[in-house]
Each structure stands twice: as C-alpha cells, then as structure tokens.
Amino acid sequence: MASYHLSVKTGGKGSASPHADYIAREGKYAREKDSDLEHKESGNMPAWAAHKPSEFWKAADTSERANGCTYREIEIALPRELKPEQRLELVRDFVQQEIGDRHAYQFAIHNPKAAIAGGEQPHAHIMFSERINDGIHRDPEQYFKRANTKEPDAVAQKRHVSGKHRPNAKNTLLPRGRRWADLQNKHLERYQHADRVDSRSLKAQGIDREPERHLGAGQVQRFDTEQLQAILERREAERQVQQSRDERDSVIDVTTSLREALSERDTLTLKQELKSEPEQESHSGRTFDFEKEPDKLNALVSDAMKDIQEEIDLQSLVNDAMAEFQGIHQEMERQRERERLAEKQRQQEKERQRLAEQIRQKPDKGWSFSR
C-alpha cells in the first residue's frame, strides 16, 4: 500500500561529504554484498564535479562559511507498487519539479527490507546545494564564498534561503508536501494502481488512529516476540478496516446504477405519456372502416403491442431495481458487521501496543530511515 512521507533536513559545515557517501553507498558505506542501493545520479554540477559529485560536497565542507548550510536534503518514501524503473521516473520528475536547473543535486534510491514484516521499503534521498546555479564558471573555493551582487563574476553564487530553520519554513514545506503527493498520485494512476496518498495529517483526513512511529533495525532487535506480534496484529487490523471501507465504497458505487435505473424508468414513463396524448387526439372523433383500411388496424394492433411490451419492460426494470436495492442493503449490513469486528480487533491490539510501549527502553524520536 502506498504511503506518504516527505521530510526536509539540513547539513552544516563538515557533514555534506559523509552524508553524500552514505546515500551513494560509497567510502566506508560501500558494501560488496546485499546492497540496498537501487539507483544514484547527480545533476547541475559545476564542471570540476560533473563526473565526481563527491568532489562538490567535499568543497562545500571545506569552503562554505562556518555557520553556512552545506546541503539541504529532501527525504521521500516511494510506492512499493511501482517497479524500480517507474520509481526512478517518479524521482526524476520530482527533482525536475522542485530543483530544476537551479541547484546542484545528487540523489539516491534505497530499497532495504523492512525490519519487522520484511517487505520492501523504497525511499529516496535528494541532496542539493542552496547555491543558485547562474552559469558562471567558478573554482571550488569561489563557488561557496559569499555572493557579490556588484561583481557576480568575481565570487560565488547567491544562496536560495528557504525551508527548515527559516521564517517561511511552513509556507515552503506544506506546499512541497502537497506537490509531492499530487505527483505520486499521478504516477500511481499512470500505471493503473488504485492506491492514493494524502499529505494531510490522519486527523485532517478523518482517520481515527494514532500514526505509527518509524522503528529502526536496532530498536526492532530489542523487541520480544510478543511485541512484534502486537505490531503485526495492529497493522493487520488497520488493513482490514481499510479493506472494509473500500468494500463499503464499492457498494455505494452500486447505488449509482440504481439511481440510473430509476431515472430510466421515469424517462420511459414520460415517453409513454407523451406518446399516448397525440394518439388520443387523433383517434377521438374519427372512426375507421377496418375492412377497407386493414393497414390502419395493423398499425393500431402494433402500437398496442408496443405499449404492452413497454409495460412489461418497465415492470421488469422496477423488479430488478428493487432486487438490487435489497442486495445493497444486505451487503451494507455485512460491511457494518465486518467493520465492527475489525474495530474491536484494532482496539484490542492498540491496548497491547500501549502496554508494549511502556516497556520499550529507548523510544525513537522522529522519523528517519535507518538504511
């Protein structure tokens, strides 16, 4: 099931190069076996780092101001439903949408196995520099110096100030989150997946449950069997509740066809009434000699048979509509019972989860992918 996650982080002087190695699985993070790296690439780099983006981040650590931001990172969860090449297409579209050709960037797609359920956890790390790319060639030292608006050729690019730890952080992050959700939904629709994501909080979506904390591999290893089972049962209960909602919605969709049937019945009735009026007018005050005008008799018989058939069809339509309505009512009753049982199971699991939380030694603070 597709899930929404977007967060923004910043890095200070000395942290860009190690973090770039981490997301690219290079340096001390390089692993020969069982790598979770699905893809990595970079763009908008100056000529001296075009083929080796690690040089760019090293220069940022060396030459950026002491209190400067060496990089900004957007971290996003990717839908499991999409294939690797489709996820890459999604990330590239997002990078083009949010960064374009304005900033040097590097991104990596990771796909580790979930610590509890063992499923895929595809996500992307997108690092970019706040320095705006103005097309002027500068060496590494000049690139990260304070911009000179009077002589832009002399020293570094201007910095784009936005996001976390800035006065307009909320105004930047929330619209970006909505854009990411919209783009992700477009790609899910493009590849014919029914799931959709929502950037709003669970409360804003009208979902009555607590958000689940992200659990790192180290924390999961400290859980006992009962704690792990409680988490899995909670997830299963939530899955059943969502399935019940989806099935209920599909039943509601069926009522649309019922309304259409009733509308069609009313239309047929109206047509019949309109048709009978001119016939009554034409037949009133006039008689036919059917022996001399057999065609008139045949026409009247044919019209009468059509009226009878329309009545039969109309009654059949009404009967079908009533049967469909009864089926809808019965199905909705079954859905209510399934939801009641699923809610009961969810409450039981929630209580077990609360007890498990009390004995947890080191609760996780915030969301962060561990791999």
UniProtKB/Swiss-Prot annotation:
Family: Belongs to the MobA/MobL family.
Annotated source species: Salmonella typhimurium
Annotated function: This protein is probably required for relaxation complex formation.
Signal sequence extent: none
NAD as UniProt keyword: no
Record keywords: Conjugation, Mobility protein, Plasmid
Pfam families: MobA_MobL (PF03389)
Keyword hit for Transport: no
Protein name (database record): 43 kDa relaxation protein
Disulfide bond annotation, renumbered to this chain: none
UniProt biased composition (Basic and acidic residues): 22-42, 196-215, 330-365
Region annotation (Disordered) ranges: 1-46, 150-172, 196-221, 263-291, 328-371
Domain of life: Bacteria
Basic residues composition bias: residue spans: 157-168
